[in-house]
């Protein structure tokens, strides 16, 4: 789960980490008022669920409240395109207006979950700012990575070694040690999968300030934090992903034309690979889970059909706990009810597979049966390559 920068900064401030003075604004007049309260000279930052805002023109400096208001009018309501949003961009509905900070140095600091080691990692670099991705790609030796032992946690000596590695000495080093330990405490107490400060700046006055921050929460821990749903900005999410979440479906929108419905995350990832190998481009990742009902399968299929980029659908099911006849009934309910004319290829195996296939054959829908995963992928790709289909009305 993602949140905005201003929300992440409020959380960090609660753990004793210094942040710039700032105000959140929803319109130009609020931006002008915030700029006036901050002394006129201020930074205006678009709030979207993506990084790279500086390169996309989403972070601007205003010299006075009037200019701040004009910048707000330029940003609000527009789609901000960054290297992380894709070409469609994300709509700007909120702005963070902050004081200007005199910066002496920019550092990078984050703690994130390393999927390979299944442990948290402390990542630090003496070269923070907008180009940290380029540094990671071209000069990885400039980035320090410490894997944290989950049994003993992050220790003071490790935080001090990291601070010294950033070139900090004396009182500034001790301040950084405290900041790193507080960042780790925040990570654990708030069930984060990532906390990132970029840049962490050393001011001309000799203080450490979190100028920009990113925070994501572990979705599996959301039940422990009843306040988290109130932090979500649904305007930043794909409507289909929101609809899928209501039915406890794992859905991620992709850029292709072949809708995918699969049971099991591992099989879903393998399905995407097989489609790519066959020359197709998947339009989504959708996992209905291991014991979905007929109604849940139908809703999952309807979500796929609502995506206007989808020109065909590939269903890949292994029936263990899941019954193939229930999958077939759900597909038929959704496809026949919506008047869908898209080509559909279904590959299924396992529990009640013959009953499921028989239901599909007798449905009267444009459905083909794949003998195996590879055959199913090749069939749907071939059908899309030679047919021009009418859009599905769902």
Curated annotation (Swiss-Prot):
Binding site for Mg(2+): 198, 212
GO MF annotation terms: ATP binding; magnesium ion binding; succinate-CoA ligase (ADP-forming) activity; succinate-CoA ligase (GDP-forming) activity
Catalytic activity: succinate + ATP + CoA = succinyl-CoA + ADP + phosphate; GTP + succinate + CoA = succinyl-CoA + GDP + phosphate
One cellular component (GO) term of this entry: cytosol
The record's free-text note on cofactor binding: Binds 1 Mg(2+) ion per subunit.
Keyword terms, alphabetized: ATP-binding, Ligase, Magnesium, Metal-binding, Nucleotide-binding, Tricarboxylic acid cycle
Record bears the keyword Transit peptide: no
Gene Ontology biological-process annotations: succinyl-CoA metabolic process; tricarboxylic acid cycle
Superkingdom of origin organism: Bacteria
Binding site for substrate: 263, 320-322
ATP-grasp domain residues: 9-243
Positions contributing to ATP binding: 45, 52-54, 98, 101, 106
Quaternary assembly: Heterotetramer of two alpha and two beta subunits.
Family to which this protein belongs: Belongs to the succinate/malate CoA ligase beta subunit family.
UniProt name for this protein: Succinate--CoA ligase [ADP-forming] subunit beta
